[in-house]
Structure formats: structure tokens, C-alpha cells
């Protein structure tokens, strides 16, 4: 099936919405040979590898771990400033949301304006779907349970 048809047939994603597909459902829709971009390993197009390295370096610097920076062929101050601004947030949940938003926006860089139904659009969708699935897995109830477990262990 042509890539433009696949890209056009995908359900829309919303940053704060529910994921329209499970990860396995999404993979079953992809063309043979599709390399799933991965924010952890940097697998994907050369463009994604470069953006991913810049974001990881910016996060490492914001956490004070410059020694963990990777070699990047360029340095985009836009991403550094976005990550730095996210780390200014005191509330950990809001900070994580801002960082997720940076990753979301960075994934959008893979879709060329001149070709919105291209292979890059599939990469963007894959990365954004991972973000939505991660965000869907976070709940206040689970967070409170973990907090209670940690604080009860500390009180003993």
C-alpha cells in the first residue's frame, strides 16, 4: 500500500487525547521495511537521529550531566531553550508534560511541509503515538499509590 494512503488513513492524534491505536495495531498498518523511530535508541531517519541527540543533550545539560552528552553535528538553540524552560517548572507533572510537548513538537519536524503524507509523516505519527500511549498510562490513582508506598517505607 502506498505511504501517502497509509498516512492519510491514520486516525488523528491529540497530545492530551486517547490513543486511537495500540502500538501493535499501529505497527500492523505500517508498510514493510518501516523503521520505527525510537527516542531512546535514536533509530530512525538521519534527521530524527540528529534531533533526538540534540534533545537528549539539552536534557542532560538541564539535569547537570554534561558528561552524558553525545556528539551532535549541529546545535539548535531552539530545542535547548525549550528544554531549559521546561526544567524551570517546579511541579514535576507539569515539567514532564512540557518535556513531552517538546518531544511532540520535535517529532513534527520530520514531516516536510511540502509533503505532509510522506514517510516522515509516518515517523512523526509513530513518535507521537508513543507519547500519547505513555501519557495515557499515567494516572493520578497510580501516582498516589506509588507515593503512598514510598512514604510508608520511609516512615518505617
Q: What is the role of each PLM region?
A:
Residues 1-156:
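Extended alpha-helical surfaces
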